[in-house]
Each structure stands twice: as C-alpha cells, then as structure tokens.
Regions:
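Cytochrome P450
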Residues: 1-405
Length: 405
C-alpha cells in the first residue's frame, strides 16, 4: 500500500466546497481540476478529511475494507447518530445483511418486474406529453422513482404522495436551505416510523413473501438468528433513500444531456439498441455520488499519511471521469466500450439495487423518446445544481405537440 517514490513530501491541503449550489456541470469541472492537481489532498471543509481522486486508488480503497471502513460513509459526519444498513457494516457481517436481499434485486428478478416498470414509466410520460413543456425534475423524475420503488417492493401505489413528500425533504440537506438538516432529520424520523408500523402489520398479517418484500424481510435471518426489527427498519429506510433520491438525480442528468445534445438524442431515436450503452455513459460522465470511509488504523496509503479515525472521501465522481482510465473522459460517448465506470461503487459494497436502477434509467429514456422524440432544455440562464449528491434543482424541457382531433 505504500508508494512514496512519487508522492510529495507533504500532502496538499485545500478547501474544496463540494456541497454548495452551482451552475449545472460546475461540480464535475471542479472535481476534474482537483484530480489533475492532486492525487490526494486534505480537504479543510468541516472537520477535515482526505480526498482520493484517481480511479486506481479509489478502487483499491473500496477493496480494502480492513483499512477503509464503512462505519461512516459521509465525509463531514464521522460519527453519525443514524444508521444506514447494510451500508454501515464491513465484512463479514455486511454479506449476512445482504444475503436475504440478493435474489430480490438480481438481474432475473428485475427482468420479471420490467413490464410493470415500463407501464409506470409510460404512464408518467403520457401524463405530460400533451403539455409541450414540463419541469422534468418536478414531474417524471419526481414520480417515476416512487412508483418504481413501490412496485419493486410489492406495495400498492396508495402511499406514492407520501413518499414523494418525504423524498423532497430528505434531498434538501446539501441544497443550501437554512433549515435543510432539520427538515431531513424530521423526514428520516417519519420514514422510520412508517416502516416500523408497516413491519408490525406484516408480522400480524403476512402477505406472500415471493411478491411482498417486507413480508420476506420479516422472516429474514442474520446468520442463524432472526434479524432484529430495528435492523429491518434501518434497511428499509436505506433502500427507500437509494431508490428515490439518487435515481431522481441520475434521471435528471441523462435528460439534461439529451435535451442539450440533439445529435445524441436523434441517434438514440434511430438506434434504440444503444440506449443501454448510453445509460452506462451517463452514469460515468455524470456520477452523482461519492462515498466516504473511516480509516481503521494509521496507514501510509501511497505516500498519504492517514491516521486512525480520519475520514476519506473515496470519490466515485472523480474516478468515473479519470482520463488515465477513460479516453476523452470529459466527453460523453454514448456507445463507449469498454466502460469500466464505478458509479455504483466497487467490491462488496457495490450498490445492491444497481440492476434495478439501470432498468429504470433505460426504460425512462425508451418511453420518453417513444412519445417525445424531439425536445430541448428551455432555460435561457444556466440551470443550478446542488452539490454533495449532485442534482439539478429544476430541468425545464419543451417539445412540439401534435394537435388532437
């Protein structure tokens, strides 16, 4: 792990604000510039933390959980008062938490769900196609992740509005609002209370565990013992967040690109078989999330003198755009191959729902282009995006409509 021959005598220090609101695209430009200046650096934001910027170093950190622990995954919060399960666990317990869920989120299970997901995506596009304009973030990107999540869990659509409301409040923590953290904390509590009540109901009135995720989890084992209710609730909160807010953000960026790049949009209309490849490229070129790790012991990481309990931002956002790995890394090439991006992480903690997310991202493009093949971004001024989890605040789109007889 030590490689001091090319390391500077003293690691660089900087103050990089990666959480503020800025014009769309600015966050990646800043990350790209930092990566080319520093292989790693100490960021003086909050309590201070290391930032790894290069693809190979980041993969190594993901693959070394005995040094880079998941006990905290937010760089500015080394000792969180809440738990994301199974995200906040390391091997070997991590796989014990994931094991009951693996089959549910497997490629085969997602394929069986795809016809229902397509229906839901089509319904959301049909609801706005005749309007000729929409804020994509407040319409499709708001609703489809919720309906897709409820469908994937085997839940009815009755509570869709509740989940949309909670998702709004939980997504505001890095958007700059004065009360954002308080609103997010309150929404977290509301979501935990919801799943606590739902779990109690499933224990009293179980449904078919082959189609109802919560019934399946109510019987889940942690090794040889029943999984505690508090752990099941924490898992449900984590799955909710991962299914709603992150998917909404990624949906926004792929449509932002297609609304600004008519040649790519026309090519996907003419060659829809390229849409899966385009989704992978949008994930690579517009990576929205970076993970953090907590150092378990003093270590020299390729010349970087990390101390026990230091926080490290393991920047997927930087790795996915590293020109040492990706030719023309700053360009979007919708048929790029190979494409070894790590937008979903790497190693054991790779995103559990990645197959579901890929299907939803693909179906969103397929169904939109089927009804609205010609559209563009309407904003005259640069759009704004919040940092942290990089997400557009709005995305106004316009398109020609066909008069109905």
């Amino acid at each position: 792990m030590s490689d001091t021959s090319t390391a500077p005598a003293e690691p660089a220090r900087a103050r990089a604000d990666l959480s503020s609101t800025a014009p769309a695209g600015h966050h990646w430009q800043e990350i790209d510039a930092l990566r080319e200046r520093h292989r790693y650096f100490w960021n003086e934001e909050a309590q201070g933390y290391w930032v790894l910027t290069r693809y190979e170093d980041i993969r190594e950190a993901f693959q070394t959980p005995e040094v880079f622990s998941n006990h905290s995954i937010v760089a500015t919060n080394p000792d969180p008062a809440y738990r994301f399960l199974p995200s906040f666990t390391d091997p070997p317990i991590h796989m014990k938490y994931r094991q009951p869920m693996n089959a549910w989120f497997s490629p085969g299970s997602v394929r069986k769900l795809e016809p229902r997901l397509r229906e839901l995506a089509r319904a959301e596009v049909e609801a706005i196609a005749g309007e000729g304009r929409a804020d994509y973030m407040a319409t499709f990107a708001d609703r489809f992740p919720v309906s897709g999540f409820l469908a994937s869990m085997g839940l009815p659509m009755d509570d869709a509005d509740l989940f949309v409301s909670i998702a709004h409040r939980m997504s505001g923590a890095s958007g700059g609002e004065p009360d954002a953290v308080e609103r997010m904390t309150a929404a977290w509590g509301e979501l935990a209370a919801y799943w606590t009540d739902m779990l109690a109901d499933r224990r009293a009135h179980p449904l078919d565990p082959s189609v109802d995720f919560l019934t399946m989890m109510s019987d889940a084992k942690l090794g040889d013992e029943p999984m505690p209710d508090i752990d099941v609730v924490d898992i449900m909160v984590t799955l909710t967040l991962g299914s709603l807010d992150t998917l909404k953000s990624q949906l926004g960026w792929q449509m932002w690109h297609l609304g600004r790049n008519g040649d790519d949009r026309a090519r996907l209309v003419a060659e829809p078989h390229l849409i899966p490849s385009a989704v992978e490229e949008f994930l690579r070129a517009y990576p929205i999330v970076s993970m953090a790790r907590k150092v378990t012991r003093d270590v020299d990481f390729h010349g970087c003198p990390m101390k026990k309990d230091d926080m490290v931002l393991v920047s997927n956002q930087s790795a996915c755009r590293d020109p040492r790995v990706f030719e023309r890394a700053a360009d979007v090439i919708i048929d790029r191959s190979p494409n070894r991006h790590i937008a979903f992480g790497a190693s054991e903690h790779r995103c559990l729902g990645s197959h579901l997310a890929r299907a939803e991202l693909r179906l969103a493009i397929e169904e939109w282009l089927r009804l609205i093949p010609d559209f563009e971004v309407a904003a005259d001024e640069p759009l704004l995006a919040k940092g942290g989890q990089i997400s557009l605040l709005e995305l106004p789109l316009v398109w020609p409509t066909v008069a109905r007889s």
